[in-house]
Structure formats: C-alpha cells, structure tokens
Swiss-Prot record:
Lineage: Bacteria, Pseudomonadati, Bacteroidota, Bacteroidia, Bacteroidales
Active site: C351
SUPFAM superfamilies: Pentein
UniProt protein name: Peptidylarginine deiminase
GO MF terms held by the record: agmatine deiminase activity; protein-arginine deiminase activity
Enzyme type, top EC level: hydrolase
C-alpha cells in the first residue's frame, strides 16, 4: 500500500541538456518576435456574448480528456510516447501530408496510436499553451472554450481556437482581451493569477474593465494581477509559479545571490499570507533552480505530473521530491528536452503543451472540514454536476478514523437535485478523520475529490467541544470565508444542539439580502451560501435556531 501512495519519479533520457547560447537566444527571439498582437488581428477578432452563468474557469489539476501538442514539435518524442500511454494526445498538423508523416514517426517510436488524434489547421508555432483556448463550465452543466486575442503577431495561432472548438464540439466564446496562456492559472474556485501584462497589454482598457471581462467570460472574480518577479522578457506566470491544488502553490526559488531572489521570496510570502478557497492559508512549496531550471513549467495531466529537468541530477531530484511531497499519489515524471528544442528558463514543457478539459466532466464542488474542529458530529456537503447529462449514482464519502485500516464507503444523502450531505457521528475527542468524496455516473465517469482521492484526503481532528453560549461574535462557534472569487460564502459553524437553523445575511442598513434554511448537527457543519449578486461591502452573517444565535461581521 505504501508504494501505491508514493509518487514515482521517472527520468526520461531524451537528448542533450542545452543548446549553445546563440541557439537559445534565437528561440527567445522567435517566441517574442514582433512582441504584440498586430492591429489587424485585433480588428479581426470577433467578440461574442459571454457564457450564460454561472461561469467557472476549470483548473489544470481537474479532469482532462486530452493534451494538445503541435507538429513540427517543440517537445521530445519520448514525452509524446509517455503522454499517450494513459491519455489522449491531439496533434495539430497543417495538412493530411503532415498527419501521415506524424503517424509514421509515432509508429516508429512506439507511440500508442489508439490514444492519438489530429486537428488539421495551420499554425505558426508550437507554443500551444499560449494560443489555444481556456476552458470554463457555464450554464450549470456545460463546458465551453474561451478565445482571446493572442498577444503575439501570429495570425494562424490566433485563429486556432475555432478549430479546437469545432473538433471538440463545444461552444466558443470570444473575450476581447490580449492574453496568453502561459500567463494564466486558475484555482477552479474563481481566482486567477496573472502577471502585470494582463493590464499593460490591454492599455486601452482600465484595470476594472479587464477584471470585468475576466469575470464575465471565465467567472474570475478574484483577478490577482502581480508584478512579475522574474523581470524577464516573457512575463509569464508559469515561469515562476504554479497552482498544484486549491490549497497548494509552487513558487520558484533561486540562490541568495541571484538578482531575482528577493522578488521571489516576497512572492512566496505574499501567497503564504493569502487564504485559499478552502478557508486555510496556502501551502507554499519551493523548487530551487540553481541554474535557471524551469521546474514550475510543468504539466499536470490527470494523475501524472510532467516536470522539465535540465540537470544536474541532484538538483533535478530535489525538485521532483518537492512535487512528490506536495502531490502524494501522483506520478511525478522528470522529462529532459530534445536536443534541437531544449528547455529554457522561460520556455519549457508547460509552454508547449495544453490540457483539454472533459466536455462531459463529472464535477464535484466541496468546501472541506479541515484542522481542529468542535464535535461531536460533523456535517459535510457537496454539489455534483454531470456535464454529460448522465444519471449520477452513487455519491459516497470514503473515510477512516485514526489511520486505522482501509477507507470505508458511506452513501451521501441527496437533499436536493445534485446536492449531497453526510454526517460523521460517534467520534471521540482527538479522533483524526481522513475523508474524500467519490461520485460516478452512467456515462462511465468516476471522480473523487480531492482529485487524487485516498493518497491525499481531507483531514480534521475532533475536539468534542461545542460552544454553548449565544453571545454575538463567538469566533469558536462561527467562521466564514469567501471563495477566491467571492461568489460564495463558505460557513463553518459549531453548535451544541442539532436541528433546523436559519442562516441570514444582512447589509449595513439592516436589510436581509440572502437567507437559507439548513439542518445542522450538534458539532461542526460546513456549507456554502451564494453571494454572487451581493455588492462589495460589509455584511452581518447570522445563524439562529433552537435558542441559539451566532453572528459575525464579514467584509466582501
């Protein structure tokens, strides 16, 4: 079992470590040629209406149906072979002739052709991360593609998303912003991180207007635009940071005497101080780049993580071990670049691949119970959505107490369509609970949350203490935080009496602006409240019933 829970590090021996400096300089020049989108590209871009709400950007660490690469390749053949072992590889080719050439190369290299498909479309470069579309859920249970103005003067690349959407059979939405995929990462809860070029390259718009478009088209209501700490020509977030999970982020680390050292340390401290969507501070992980190794420029593809490595081996192994520590249960695979297209500090594996979301995604939304919490009982909730319009069954909570034995499965109760609950009962003080949620549907899909399930479950400790007072502001009894997008208010409440409670939200004028009724346990319950339509400002949250009234002030 222990071996099953450990990530496996696999180094693929793929050619030389580096090109001569002159060749590296040429690659950088190719990537930045002309620097910005042409005026003709901007004029030709067709903006569409935004997707119907609710809109939610899909994170890289969620379920993927495939990965996009482009021929001629910027990645080694051994990487494609490894990708195609478990996942679908979609190769962009310019013609049937190119397709046949690639099939021959794949066959000769032992690539699993049953996991390969092709899109025939003209493109200008192999940086699929930068110009292919961004995926979002919309209209409750649909997956769509969001296009943008590619911020480089490559018209064929800029046109590609329409072919991508046609191939996938999904709706494409045109968001009239200059963007690039290497400068975008989202947590799946309404937050996105980008460097400052998200604003400076859209200088005709105010920052508020840029933020509004990100909200309308992607559901991003916390647009975290930061000054790029690398200070390089590219200004892409994937050159220094990466979301690994809703509560985990990887930040590049360099030696103390490196000119970027302080800026990167400041960035790590910035994220360590932020509250993630689960209500805890981010876990910040660091990968030391002793010689510009691009360790944050990795690809998460379902339960595997492909990390670019350049050597020396000891430094590579340290970086891979950081991933293994942060992502237990995932297979961590180190990949060396090809001799003709090596990994650079500002251009590596993530830049040259792009995950493709599952249009029939079985999505689980959950705000977990974490840390020390009052008991004796604990209630969790989850929303489960089938984007394939399939019948969902079963939805279960897998759990174990004090690390004893295997995880046990318990059916969750469907309280309303797509909304499920489960209560932990009979726990003792100091019991340590591990749990994850599992769902399946009749399309054959099965998902767990957290994504990896058993190797990295949610964990909480039962304190068996309930708050018996009814004094306003008892923080021990009532805690609330916004998801990163501030569209939902997550509430954790500890009570000494089980029963029906009314949860209400008041504005500063004393007007009730939102309300819901919940069955809560004697102990800790965690649930969420829709506050998407509420304006920024100060509110009072009230939980009352059964002779108990708990209140707290919150700022949106």
């Amino acid at each position: 079992m222990k071996k099953l829970l450990q990530a496996k590090a696999l180094i693929l021996a793929l050619g030389l470590f580096q090109l001569p400096a002159i060749a590296q300089t040429q690659m950088q020049a190719d990537r930045t040629n002309g620097q910005f989108a042409t005026e003709e590209m901007q004029r030709a871009f067709q903006e569409t209406n935004p997707p119907a709400g609710p809109v939610r950007a899909i994170a890289e660490y969620e379920r993927s149906a495939a990965v996009l690469v482009r021929y001629p390749f910027g990645i080694p053949m051994e990487l494609i072979k490894e990708l195609a072992k478990n996942d679908k590889v979609i190769t962009i080719v310019a013609s049937e002739s190119q397709k046949n050439t690639v099939i021959t190369q794949y066959t000769q290299s032992g690539v699993n052709l049953s996991n390969c498909d092709f899109i025939i479309a003209k493109t200008d470069s192999y940086w699929t991360r930068d110009y292919t579309g961004w995926f979002a859920m919309y209209d409750t249970n649909k997956v769509g593609l969001v296009d943008f103005i590619y911020n480089r003067p490559r018209p064929n690349d800029d046109e590609f998303p329409k072919y991508e959407a046609q191939y996938l059979g999904i709706e494409m939405f045109g968001m009239k912003l200059k963007q690039t995929g290497g400068n975008y990462m989202t947590d799946g809860y309404g937050s996105a991180v980008q460097s400052h070029i998200a604003y400076t390259e859209n200088s005709s718009l105010s920052q508020a207007q840029v933020n509004q478009k990100m909200k309308d088209y992607l559901g991003i209501t916390h647009h975290d635009v930061v000054q790029d700490p690398n200070g390089e020509y590219i200004n892409h977030v994937d050159c220094w940071g990466k979301y690994l999970a809703p509560n985990k982020i990887l930040i590049r680390k360099v030696p103390d005497n490196h000119p970027q050292h302080q800026a990167l340390e400041d960035m790590a401290a910035y994220f360590a101080a932020q509250t993630c969507a689960w209500g805890t501070k981010y876990e910040v992980y660091r990968a030391l780049a002793t010689n510009e190794q691009p360790y944050t420029n990795s690809l998460i593809l379902n339960n595997r993580v492909f990390v670019p490595v350049n050597g020396p081996a000891s430094v590579d192994n340290d970086a891979l071990n950081v991933y293994k520590t942060a992502m237990p249960g995932y297979e961590i695979i180190g990949v060396k670049g090809a001799s003709g297209t090596p990994w650079l500090g500002t251009d590596a594996l993530h830049c040259r691949t792009h995950e493709v979301a599952d249009k029939g995604y079985l999505y689980i939304k959950h705000y977990p119970i974490l840390g020390e919490q009052a008991g004796p009982d604990y209630k969790i909730e989850a929303d489960v959505v089938s984007c394939a319009n399939a019948t969902i069954s079963p939805v279960q909570c897998y759990y174990r107490i004090n690390g004893s034995g295997s995880f046990k499965a318990a059916d969750m109760t469907m309280e309303s369509t797509g909304h499920y609950t489960y209560s932990f009962t009979g726990l003792n003080k100091n019991d340590k609970v591990e749990y994850y949620i599992s769902a399946a549907d009749n399309s054959g899909r099965k998902e767990t949350y957290p994504f990896i399930g058993e190797p990295d479950p949610f964990k909480f400790t039962c304190m068996n203490e309930t708050n018996t007072c009814t004094v306003t502001g008892a923080a021990k009894a009532l805690r609330a935080w916004f998801n990163a997008g501030r569209s939902e208010l997550a509430v954790s409440v500890s009570l000494n009496i089980a029963g029906t409670y009314r949860i209400k939200l008041y504005n500063t004028a004393g007007e009730e602006v939102a309300a819901m009724t919940k069955e809560l346990v004697a102990g800790t319950s965690v649930f969420s409240m829709d506050v998407y339509s509420q304006a920024p400002g100060t509110y009072v949250l009230v939980v009352e019933g059964n002779g108990i009234r708990e209140t707290m002030k919150i700022l949106k």
